[in-house]
């Protein structure tokens, strides 16, 4: 009896975490909205007015920008509104998805509803986002025309564009599933969609280099271009699925992933967070940091662990700690959740670095 109860509890927990792949994309968007709210609350408690380093209104708007308190209140209200709208859709999607898998020969109408529900939620979220946040709408329309001045506007562009890159894998799952509305998934269309955030950020770096002629922008562009071989290997492995070439491609892909993770970790810490020393952190200034030192050290450690999470999964497979065909350690899709959380940590210390550059370093 106790064993049965234990198994049922484990199954219940697994069902909570194992959200259907297309719905996971929606859950991650909601999570990102709440993380942004918590970030603003953190800066409120830390007395760091980061509203001074990001543009909160479109450039031609003559009204003063949002204060940090206003920004936090607006973000919280928006996250609450979207969460309340999505919750009924979420439970309906999960229920119908499970129902579709249980019954034999599911009704065509149920299949169509299951395929459409995540798409409806996605359209709803982005419609409200673009309607109620004019600065996001402005930056989205001009994403390839990134403006380097004022710096606060550039920071807003970068926060939006870099956050989108963290949704590449969820986008693949979402696009694959949604394309089933048309009976069969579009061939490799999901990879094209996942490529868009990377290309946007890559082209932004090249445009900035053409305007400013700063060498670091080329190295930043190189960082984003490291994603291209990884996606190429994914595409080729599909072509050679089931053959010996597939395993060779996976091996090559892991080397590219190792290079990409190492490069991006260095860039996060050294360039984006303006930290040049693990001991003194910002060694060139007496007022080295604006937060507690242990926060920076913890962030670097967490960034390292999450950047290389794919490697921990791979090592766990080789050590037979998880199944050989498993792509997770704790629960399905964990890497996508961890990436959104890692991005939230990156945003905290990116804004901290911008605040330091504008105020503390002077």
Swiss-Prot record:
<feature type="topological domain" description="Extracellular">
    <location>
        <begin position="106"/>
        <end position="109"/>
    </location>
</feature>
<dbReference type="GO" id="GO:0016020">
    <property type="term" value="C:membrane"/>
</dbReference>
<feature type="domain" description="EXS">
    <location>
        <begin position="181"/>
        <end position="362"/>
    </location>
</feature>
<dbReference type="GO" id="GO:0015031">
    <property type="term" value="P:protein transport"/>
</dbReference>
<dbReference type="GO" id="GO:0005789">
    <property type="term" value="C:endoplasmic reticulum membrane"/>
</dbReference>
<dbReference type="GO" id="GO:0000301">
    <property type="term" value="P:retrograde transport, vesicle recycling within Golgi"/>
</dbReference>
<comment type="similarity">
    <text>Belongs to the ERD1 family.</text>
</comment>
<feature type="topological domain" description="Cytoplasmic">
    <location>
        <begin position="131"/>
        <end position="362"/>
    </location>
</feature>
<dbReference type="InterPro" id="IPR004342">
    <property type="entry name" value="EXS_C"/>
</dbReference>
<feature type="transmembrane region" description="Helical">
    <location>
        <begin position="110"/>
        <end position="130"/>
    </location>
</feature>
<keyword id="KW-0472">Membrane</keyword>
<keyword id="KW-0653">Protein transport</keyword>
<keyword id="KW-0256">Endoplasmic reticulum</keyword>
<dbReference type="GO" id="GO:0006621">
    <property type="term" value="P:protein retention in ER lumen"/>
</dbReference>
<comment type="function">
    <text>Required for the retention of luminal endoplasmic reticulum proteins, affects glycoprotein processing in the Golgi apparatus.</text>
</comment>
<keyword id="KW-1133">Transmembrane helix</keyword>
<dbReference type="Pfam" id="PF03124">
    <property type="entry name" value="EXS"/>
</dbReference>
<keyword id="KW-0813">Transport</keyword>
<dbReference type="GO" id="GO:0006486">
    <property type="term" value="P:protein glycosylation"/>
</dbReference>
<keyword id="KW-0812">Transmembrane</keyword>
<feature type="topological domain" description="Cytoplasmic">
    <location>
        <begin position="46"/>
        <end position="84"/>
    </location>
</feature>
<feature type="transmembrane region" description="Helical">
    <location>
        <begin position="25"/>
        <end position="45"/>
    </location>
</feature>
<feature type="transmembrane region" description="Helical">
    <location>
        <begin position="85"/>
        <end position="105"/>
    </location>
</feature>
<feature type="topological domain" description="Extracellular">
    <location>
        <begin position="1"/>
        <end position="24"/>
    </location>
</feature>
<protein>
    <recommendedName>
        <fullName>Protein ERD1</fullName>
    </recommendedName>
</protein>
